[in-house]
Amino acid sequence: MSVVTMKQLLEAGVHFGHQTRRWNPKMKRYIFTERNGIYIVDLQKTVKKLDEAYEFVKELAANGEKIMFVGTKKQAQDAVKNEAERCEMFYVNQRWLGGMLTNFQTISKRLNRFYELEQMEEDGTFEVLPKKEVQSLRREHAKLDKFLGGLRGMEDLPGALFVIDPKKEKIAVAEARKLGIPIVSIVDTNCDPDEVDYVIPGNDDAIRAVKLITEKIADSVLEGKQGVQLAE
């Protein structure tokens, strides 16, 4: 039994690719046909590939590995945050800061600063500091929260990345590839599938399509974690 039906994929518009003039020939094997100047993704392949990605992520989660959800384009931001939080994984949905993986030590320092500012607010330090200084610290905290809030509690590199649109997130993809971190991704007809370990061919621009696939990846994490709990 597949984790998603053709009907669900059709209803969410996962089959709509990009205009034929904006395509990557490497995606040819995942394209079913062309309609009104738009490529239509072969959903039978999407079902099969999503099943493979689901199993891979489930296995990782069962082994206690962390998955980082990455999607900074508007259509992906909410799904990435909501689904990563639902399965208690890390996410980046505002902007990928260069070095988030390859220079993780620096990111760790910024995360520690983020925790330090939160602690200052909680333990009453802000109440005894000058108002101007508190305003400045609050601004600093808000900025850190915006860009690093989804990495709260992250102590080492993730076991895999789940990426929405590897073309848009090319820096994240390059960093993961450099470090040998596997990439699971929704790959549209204008992307290069060779950069991704687990390709899920489909529409990465429609909110409903992105939400559906992201939900399934979060489900696979939860199923993997549940397997661990049942084994215990």
Curated annotation (Swiss-Prot):
One of its GO terms (biological process) is translation. InterPro entries: Ribosomal_uS2, Ribosomal_uS2_bac/mit/plastid, Ribosomal_uS2_CS, Ribosomal_uS2_flav_dom_sf. Pfam families: Ribosomal_S2 (PF00318). It comes from the Bacteria. One of its GO terms (molecular function) is structural constituent of ribosome. The keyword Ribosomal protein applies. Belongs to the universal ribosomal protein uS2 family. PANTHER family: 30S RIBOSOMAL PROTEIN S2 PROKARYOTIC AND ORGANELLAR, SMALL RIBOSOMAL SUBUNIT PROTEIN US2M. This is Small ribosomal subunit protein uS2. The lineage of its organism: Bacteria, Bacillati, Bacillota, Clostridia, Natranaerobiales.
